[in-house]
Design a protein with these regions (language model features):
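Intrinsically disordered, low-complexity terminal regions enriched in charged/polar residues
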Residues: 1-222, 226-229, 233-238, 245
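Conserved kinase catalytic-core helix
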Residues: 237-268
Length: 268
């Protein structure tokens, strides 16, 4: 995200990402208008002739009006009990790039492994509003061409000094095998958008690597993780019994899956 700060006849350009901010030297936009002009030109002329402006995410797009009508009919047919306002469906739904690569069996084998597209239904289920953070957003999605199941998609900016989520799912898989994962979502795939094979990427932070000391530990990469099934917020349960059963399942997932695999969950 870019911000232009104007202070009398002087200006500075600020470039924010999920790890920090890069600030230009102050320049006089009256006597040296070429700096501001070049910035604005480059802003709307990204490299590689990609659409949009510099920093825009080309892996997430708005559906067309025809796609909205088609996907609305598909979602209503496959998930008639799903409650979502028609206006929010039309306004907030998105197409997003994901990766389908389940670790274990019991999944839809008709979905080709690798990068694919999913349809995010309506507004996010949960969203972090902090700028300098993982900025986690959780969507409810269906896989394009395989809309009979709902999945949870977590979009976040992971610190590169930390292990990816698939590491922990693989560890649980090693200890649990093909047995039932009680109280724990199943890993369906992960897409590291910041893995540019050594090339600069708009899905990697830049400010952290410019710091001295341990600044590189704050470097982040844009990751999307797909899991199944989709959970419910505690506030949406219709009875105390239903809520208690949900809490019990979460505790079982912690004890039988994480602790038995020698994994300690940080928030706990």
């Amino acid at each position: 995200m870019f911000v232009l700060g104007v202070y009398g006849h002087d200006a500075r350009i600020y470039r924010f990402d999920r790890s920090g901010v890069i600030v230009s030297k102050a320049f006089n936009y009256i006597s040296s208008p070429e700096y501001l002009g070049e910035f604005l030109w480059r802003l709307v002329h990204p490299e590689n002739s990609s659409p949009g402006i510099i920093g825009s995410d080309t892996t997430i797009t708005r559906p067309t009006s025809k796609e909205i009508e088609r996907m609305l009919a598909i979602v209503q047919r496959h998930h008639p009990t799903l409650e979502i306002e028609d206006a929010k469906f039309r306004q907030d739904s998105r197409w997003m790039d994901v990766c389908w690569s389940p670790l274990c069996g019991g999944h839809d084998s008709s979905v080709p492994r690798g990068r694919t597209r999913c349809f995010a239904i309506g507004p996010p289920l949960w969203q972090s509003t902090n700028l300098f953070s993982r900025a986690t957003v959780v969507w409810r999605v269906v896989i394009k061409g395989h809309e009979d199941k709902l999945y949870a998609l977590k979009d976040s900016w992971r610190e590169l000094c930390r292990n990816p989520e698939v590491f922990f799912y693989e560890r649980i898989q090693k200890f649990k095998g093909e047995s039932e994962w009680v109280g724990l979502a199943k890993f369906m795939g992960s897409l590291n958008l910041g893995d540019g094979q050594g090339k600069p990427s708009r899905h990697r932070t830049s400010s952290a690597t410019l710091r001295t000391g341990e600044g590189s530990l704050q470097d982040r990469s844009h990751v999307r993780t797909l899991t199944y099934p989709v959970g419910h917020q505690l506030s949406t349960f219709t009875s105390t019994r239903q809520m208690v059963l949900g809490l019990r399942a979460a505790i079982e997932g912690l004890v039988f899956n994480l602790w038995s695999s020698n994994i300690i969950l940080k928030p706990l």
